[in-house]
Amino acid sequence: MASSETRMNKAREKEEAIANGVKLRALQASLMQMKSSPSSNYSLRNPSSSSAASPASRPLPNLSAHDYPVFTPSYEDEPVSAFHHKNLTLSETWDEDGVGLVDGDTYLSDSYKTSTSRKTVMMPHQDSHHHVYTMSDALRSPPLHFYTTGRSNCGSVDFRSVSSCNDYNKQKGFDTKSLKSSNLVVPLTDSHSAVVSSQPRNRGGRVMSWLFPKLKKKQKSNSIFNSPSITEKSEEVSEVLKDSGSGVEKLKRELMEANRSRDAALTQVSEMKSSLGELSEKLQYLESYCDNLKKALREATEVVSQENSGGRSSGKKNSEMPVSEEVMVEGFLQIVSEARLSIKQFLKTLVSEIDEEDSTLIGNINTLLQPHNLSFTSKYSKIIQYHLEAIISQSVYQDFENCVFQKNGKPKLLDPEQDRQANFSSFASLRNLSWNEVLKKGTKYYSDEFSRFCDEKMSLIITTLNWTRPWSEQMLQAFFVAAKCVWLLHLLAFSFNPALGILRVEENREFESSFMEDMGADRQRSALSRGPARVKVMVMPGFYVLDRVLRCKVLCRYKSLG
């Protein structure tokens, strides 16, 4: 019940507020009409009997703001209680504001005091009849602007009408022309007076609050921002902004640190670049200095070599070789040692292949040993071994002095320098050749000259020994190793400038220890022979290696003193 009564009271207050607003607008319309005709005399009086008898002057029954919804203002933005802050009558309000008429016109307050039932506003009409506007006529008028004159010596009030509402009057069935020629009475009730009394008292520049709804809306919008939900949202937004601000500060610090690190890195890079530039300059200086030293050393070596070797220039003769002369000498001595060992191993394999029942082969070997008063038996001694070794070495090293290892052979290249380089290149390519590679592809695949050399030496050995049996694989492998070492030794010897020479000695030559090595000296020494030694047989040849001599191995005979 209480809630329903509250709703009814609110609705009633709203309706009263709307009615008060309509009445106030009607009053303003009448005052504005008075302002539009300044030449005529304005009078406020009670309605006469003739005007009361006119049909148009009769008050319209039960007219209210609900009959004119177009002019019903909306007061949602204003509290309803604002219309009741001061309960004054229209006459009191006008008395307080000092609004009156001069020049013989009666005061507006006196006119309102004499009226008992209805209060009317009498206004002059164009046909010199007084036209009375009632509140019903005011409802047909549009909203008006109210203002007063600024003259201090004149108490008259100026009013101006803005527009009309003919469209709405036609819909209601009223004749506008008849209304212009008739006197209409607007009833002014106490509620109307209350509306009029609610006007502000300040003079000059007074503005109604309902004329400026934007101000109210602005106040309302300001109140919206003060609501708790908006406050919470603003707090959240402020927190978010604060967090974002801290994040931005953190990013700024990180950016500053990154910039500092970058500057430091750039500084280090610049320092390193400058250091590298200095090092490159020093390196170029050292390279040029080393080149000058090498050139000076080469020239000095050439001069010394010419003085020591009688015009042979060791620096010039090996200047174009990929390795130095010392390396070549060491390699040559190593190949000589390998060749001697490989020939001994081949001889052992050959002797192991001899069959004692093969009388033809044994007879051929005895024929070779007969000049030395020796014969081949199963229990042969070292002397027989040395003699057989001498026979094999003589066959293998035959024609070693020739440039192509052949009797009366001719060089392939006429330019000695190019020939030396070709010999060394062939030496390097065949140095690591193995027996398994030869079994797969043959010696001719790797070198035609080496293949021809192997065929010639094998044929010479077979012819010398009158060998009639086929060679076994083991014997062939031993022969390949021996032939390879001798061939490499020849290639390397002819890679020098001039080529290294072979040292051979003939039989019955006087023994010279500087060039010969007696392999049977211990046995002869045990025989206490003191006579001059003579070469019996050369077992292994020697070589002339530049300014040195690699002695040959021989067997000597000694004559006893008796």
Curated annotation (Swiss-Prot):
Low complexity bias spans: 36-61
Keywords: Coiled coil
Keyword set includes Coiled coil: yes
Inducers of expression: By auxin.
Claim: Transcription is one of the keywords in the record: no
Coiled-coil ranges from the UniProt annotation: 246-306
Tissue spec: Highly expressed in root tips, shoot apices and developing flowers.
Deletion consequences: No visible phenotype under normal growth conditions.
Stretches the record annotates as Disordered: 29-61, 303-322
Lineage top rank: taxon: Eukaryota
InterPro entries: GIL1_IRKI_C, IRKI-like
Oligomeric and partner information: Interacts with IRK.
Protein name: IRK-interacting protein
Source species: Arabidopsis thaliana (Mouse-ear cress)
Name of the coding gene: IRKI
